[in-house]
Amino acid sequence: MAAPCVRLGSVRCTGTLLRYFCGSARHQAAAASHEEIDIPRRKSWDKTAVLQALAYTVSHDPTAAHYMFQDDPFLVPKTSSEFRLYSLSKESGRNAAKYIIGTHPKLFQNDIAEPHIPCLMPENFQPQIEGVSEEALKERIQLRRIKESIDLFDQLLQGGTAPSLETTNRLLDLICFYGDREPTRDIQTSEQNQQDDQDQQETEDSKKRPGQYRKASEILGSWRENNNAERIFNLMPERNAHSFCTLIQGMVKYGSSNKAFNTYTDLMNNRLTADVQTFNALILAAPDMKEKYNEKWDLIVELLKHMVQQNVRPNLLTFNSVLKSLRKCGTMARGLALQTINEMKALNIEPSLGTYNHLLGVFYKGALSPRGQTEILSEVLDEIEGRSFTLRDPDDVYFFTNAMRVCLDLKDIELAYRLHALQQTADNRGLMGDFYLQSTYYGRFFNLLCMMENIDVILKWYRELIPSLYYPNSRGMLDLLQALDMDNCLDLIPQIWKDIKQIGHSNKVELVEEVLKLMARDVQPAELQAAFADTALDIKSLYEVRDRVRIVLEWSSASLGNISVLLARAGRTEEAWKMLQRFKTNHRVPSTEVVDEFLSRAKMDANTNLAISLVQLAVGFSLPNTGKLAERVMEEFNVSEEQRLTLEDLQKSHSSSSSSSESSDSDRE
């Protein structure tokens, strides 16, 4: 489908734009050379400059919790779920306090601060101006009361008093920003809006395939057909460029790209000029208007040429929008992305971390990307290493997480160290994003460490990152266990198991069975074998029903066998035999290796009765090695004549049961 805007012909590259913008930049540089330099008589410091200077004198404490929590062992989270619960609880309490103060401001008028501190006093969120007037409309717009503002606007029109263009534009700004919905900060939301949203969501969900990724517009909510923003825009007797630009940006934000370009066409037909924010929004929406990659790029270039015609100077977000759209243009986007970066440099626009994040997205599509294309991260780090960044684009917070993903897929630990050093430079750690992005970054970093480094380095980072910066998931702990296995440091497993319990992963079956498997695989020295047995008993308690325990693990043959073997090797024969009895109660069958391990223990203890009991147990489970087991007992143990007869009877009963089962199988055939 052709874009509903004026076409200016096909464009091979953006060289014309580069020459235009470079000329503009040279003109500004020449004008700046004639300006007088004004040296300030004193240095103006930020209000928090002293605190920042003090913060730089203190290094990170790996044992400290996040600053948002109380310095109390009971109130410090130990798991990722507790971190989320505690942080949400604290934020919920803060919001509840704000709601109470905002709802009943008259109850909080006691001002004890000297001098007066306005931010400590409650804000008045209730309308003070009664009646139908433009001043009342302005007040409700200021209070972000969308439904009341729309009702008051309609009443003014019905009374024959049209609000001014400035007031109407402010109302349009409010409606387009929130997508014709009440702001989420309001506790009490319009029931009608909730019902409309629910009905529309059910319609969208019925059309959506299971497992399909959701767009940002789907998370925010879609642009509803003939909503109040469009209605008010059509009722406006006079419209200026601000009116059109606001409507276009709202349509793009809530996923109505086609309507946005139609409105942009109307703007140009009215001989008005769009601002840079509107062009940025249209560039982001351009890939949704076309199917082929080259057509998407042609539409982006066309919008850039419109900016040249209308003398609209691009900013950082303009180029970041171009790069973000190029991520949807396939392999042809790589050369175009480099051209975009060159134009930024020609305009003296400093790239942000979001710029480099989009560049990585263009060049790196996954672990199967050619090596030559993935070296772009090394070149990016060469350029930005050692520099301090500030937040200039909302997408800046995705750089570190996505760059660490590239390092993990490439299995390049040196690149990861360089990236982490950049993250530790100055205040760059403040650009890590929310808790989820931070956890993803550190999780990928720790995963790469477990794959590529020796155990000493891994444990150094383990103590530094966990749990002050990172709460590992079960996958991260499995990686650590595999690293311990690779470096033959299984003696650390009891301590690691305590950490697994502390961070809340003791209910993960895969992780628990991996711990048991590593401990039971080889015979260890007596002291370590005793520690393994204590750990096995601790794990055994997780399978038992107890009060106030919601999740109880289910016994498997592997877990029963490994715990039995660990107890037997530590000389705890009675406890090991009790574990062996659990096979029958839990309808599990022990492996031949478990029975052989018990027989070896019985031989060490010269316990003939235990050996005979093992043969009886093997007969009960119809194990295939029962005959050999009985022969081994008669050869290796001092058995009495009565015991020998018992063993021979067990052999015969096992042979007869085996032959009967074979004959029944042949009859079925």
UniProtKB/Swiss-Prot annotation:
Q: Where is the composition biased (Acidic residues)?
A: 194-203
Localization per Swiss-Prot or TrEMBL: Mitochondrion
Q: Does the keyword Repeat apply?
A: yes
List GO BP terms, alphabetically: mitochondrial translation; regulation of translation
PPR repeats mapped onto the chain: 129-163, 164-199, 209-239, 240-274, 275-314, 315-351, 352-392, 396-430, 438-472, 473-507, 556-590
InterPro entries per UniProt: Pentatricopeptide_rpt, PTCD3, Rib_mS39_PPR, TPR-like_helical_dom_sf
Q: Please name one Pfam family that this protein belongs to.
A: Rib_mS39_PPR
In alphabetical order, the GO MF annotations are:
ribosomal small subunit binding; rRNA binding
Annotated region (Disordered) at: 186-218, 648-669
Biased composition regions of type Low complexity, renumbered to the chain: 653-663
Under PROSITE patterns, the record lists:
PPR
State where the transit peptide lies: 1-13
* Annotated keywords: Mitochondrion, Repeat, Ribonucleoprotein, Ribosomal protein, RNA-binding, rRNA-binding, Transit peptide, Translation regulation
Q: Which domain of life is it from?
A: Eukaryota
Transport as UniProt keyword: no
Quick one: a GO cellular component term? Answer: ribonucleoprotein complex
Q: What is its main location?
A: mitochondrion
The family assignment reads: Belongs to the mitochondrion-specific ribosomal protein mS39 family.
What does this chain do? Mitochondrial protein that may have a role in mitochondrial translation.
Name of the protein in question: Small ribosomal subunit protein mS39
**Classification of source organism:** Eukaryota, Metazoa, Chordata, Craniata, Vertebrata
